[in-house]
Design a protein with these regions (language model features):
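A domain-start/cap signature at the N-terminus of enzymes
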Residues: 19-52, 61-64, 72-75, 101, ...
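Active-site glycine-rich loops that stabilize anionic/oxyanionic intermediates
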Residues: 57-61, 263
Length: 288
């Protein structure tokens, strides 16, 4: 009997250690009849009420655990939720941002992501006040759509290589200011820096990046622009970054735009420490 008790104790210790060492948790909830899958990254030693950052994949992508936010989270002590988009009418996992080929698709990703956020906050004891949203490409477009919406789940957004669709710019009026940070390459041929007002690329008409970001500068009533040029981390590719920071906002919501000169369609981790830069921006907005 004693031997069995000792064996049980040893097994409990081993299981407890493995549970503590496991940093990624697979989870899901049902929203509007769809199972919404996501992974949650919980760094070692994470504290109750820690911040939460959502990372959204690009068009056709999936749950990518090696995204720029995870490494930063492991050092800074915040959680990362990595959701999986549903398949659109073309059969590609994506976020419903109103591309022409998504017409008639009834998935409401604003609602779904808000529901996931509420669940993850409660289930993993994370901060409701300090939950943020970032994403790449199609995930970046979703960041803009979320910013325009009436959602209350996300305190700030940081699209990377993201676009504002013309329909958003013309038809939507943001109900409140929100801190926004865009990182974008000037040589991006998928999500053009100069926009695509004639829908030559097939994604739908979208705004030039500086003009799209300018909407939020005005909406947030920023009164000062600071500009800084820095060399990229990779000295061989010749890229450099112009950091446009729009500050002294009357609403307390700053806007940043990092113009990666020479940068293509990517997360720009060769040019800057993307995860650290995004976290630095989010951190400025945090509620203590």
């Amino acid at each position: 009997m004693k031997k069995n008790k000792w064996l049980l104790l040893v097994l409990c210790c081993i299981c407890g250690f493995n549970a503590q060492a496991q940093q990624f948790v697979e989870d899901s909830i049902k929203v509007d009849g769809h199972m919404r899958r996501f992974d949650v990254f919980l760094p070692e030693g994470i504290k109750p009420d820690a911040p939460l950052v959502f990372y959204l994949h690009g068009y056709g992508g999936g749950i990518y655990r090696k995204n720029p936010m995870v490494e930063t989270a492991s050092r800074e002590g915040f959680a990362v939720c990595i959701p999986q988009g549903l398949k659109d009418p073309k059969g590609k996992p994506s976020w419903n941002v109103g591309y022409p080929f998504q017409e008639g698709w009834k998935v409401d990703d604003v609602k779904s992501l808000s529901k996931i956020a509420a669940y993850v906050q409660k289930r993993y004891h994370l901060s409701r006040e300090n939950t943020f949203l970032t994403g790449m490409s199609n995930g970046g477009e979703m960041c803009y759509l979320m910013a325009y919406s009436k959602q209350k789940a996300f305190k700030a957004v940081a699209p990377v290589a993201g676009l504002t669709m013309v329909w958003m710019y013309r038809d939507l009026e943001a109900c409140k200011p929100i801190p926004l940070f865009e990182i974008h390459g000037t040589e991006d041929r998928t999500s053009e820096w100069t926009g695509d007002l004639d829908n030559k690329g097939g994604w739908g008409a979208y705004m030039p990046v500086p003009l799209a970001v300018g909407y939020w500068v005005a909406k947030n009533r920023c009164t000062k622009e600071e500009t800084e040029r820095v060399e990229g981390l990779n000295k061989e590719n010749g890229h450099y970054i112009i950091k446009h920071r729009f500050t002294e906002s009357a609403t307390g919501c700053d806007v940043w735009l990092y113009e990666v000169v020479g940068g293509k369609h990517s997360t720009h981790t060769e040019d800057i420490k993307t995860g650290d830069e995004i976290w630095s921006f989010f951190k400025k907005t945090m509620k203590e």
